[in-house]
């Protein structure tokens, strides 16, 4: 069987909702987005959004979604909260299965200002962001510009920290923690090392030995 459900924001699209070019977000954009991620999304997106078996427009600005069954009580929340709404007029002429570097048209509090593939991406705050006055967004999005720098690997990332390219780092590598944090900025106090116990469950962090190596052939070495 199927479960028919109305669930925000699909049963009601805020009339103020708009993309960065000023055009309104419509039900057609929502349905287009759903179809794109059902057919051309990642495997996980196809699996999740594929559970919406049919849709129909209801009322002035509503959308009714029929799900494959009512076993997954969280599914309507996932669809409502995580489905990216993309503009049909922009993406209908783009093959989303292929990589492209054009700055896309979005609707969020920030938009891409510039990008250098593999190096950096800059986001600029949208001054007239349509949802900035909603209670859920109060106190957020306070920076005019956000810059993400990309590093080739963890070694390069650590070296960038040592020379002051960024200010805060969480270290997960036990070997690196005990052997590489003796640089000048630590000695003169510019970098403060602090171990904090949080008592939260975390993933495994261990030293794994390859028992196929000759050095471990003697069982007494393994224990």
PLM region spans:
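Extracellular/periplasmic solute-recognition and catalytic clefts
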Residues: 54-57, 113-124, 149-213
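Aromatic- and charge-enriched surface segment that lines or borders ligand/interaction sites
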Residues: 1-43, 64, 157-160, 215-218
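Short, well-ordered beta-strand elements
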Residues: 3-11, 30-33, 63-65, 108-111, ...
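Alpha-helical secondary-structure segments
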Residues: 26-35, 62-64, 108-109, 140-145, ...
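Gly/Pro-rich hinge or "lid" segments in bacterial periplasmic/extracellular proteins
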Residues: 79-145, 155-156
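Extracytoplasmic/secreted proteins, especially bacterial periplasmic and envelope-associated proteins
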Residues: 25, 29-36, 47-50, 73, ...
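Surface-exposed binding/hinge segments that line
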Residues: 12, 18, 46-91, 109-116
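Short helix-loop capping/hinge motifs at secondary-structure junctions, enriched
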Residues: 17-23, 92-93, 129-132, 212-221
């Amino acid at each position: 069987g199927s479960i028919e459900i109305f669930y925000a924001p699909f049963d009601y699209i805020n009339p103020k909702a708009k993309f960065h070019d000023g055009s309104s977000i419509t039900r057609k954009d929502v349905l287009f987005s759903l179809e794109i991620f059902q057919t051309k999304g990642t495997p996980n997106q196809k699996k999740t959004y594929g559970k919406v078996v049919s849709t129909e427009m209801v009322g002035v600005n509503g959308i009714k979604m029929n799900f494959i069954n009512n076993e997954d009580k969280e599914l309507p929340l996932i669809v409502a909260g995580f489905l990216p709404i993309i503009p049909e007029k922009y993406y209908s002429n783009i093959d989303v299965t292929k990589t492209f570097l054009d700055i896309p048209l979005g609707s969020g509090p920030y938009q891409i200002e510039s990008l250098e593939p593999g190096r950096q991406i800059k986001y600029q705050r949208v001054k007239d962001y349509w949802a900035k006055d909603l209670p859920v967004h109060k106190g957020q999005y306070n920076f005019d510009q956000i810059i993400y720098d990309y590093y080739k690997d963890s070694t390069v990332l650590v070296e960038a920290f040592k020379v002051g390219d960024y200010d805060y780092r969480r270290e997960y590598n036990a070997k690196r923690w005990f052997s590489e944090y003796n640089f000048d900025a630590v000695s003169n106090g510019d970098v403060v090392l602090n171990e904090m116990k949080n008592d939260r469950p975390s993933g495994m962090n261990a030293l794994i030995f390859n028992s196929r190596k000759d050095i471990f052939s003697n069982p007494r070495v393994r224990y």
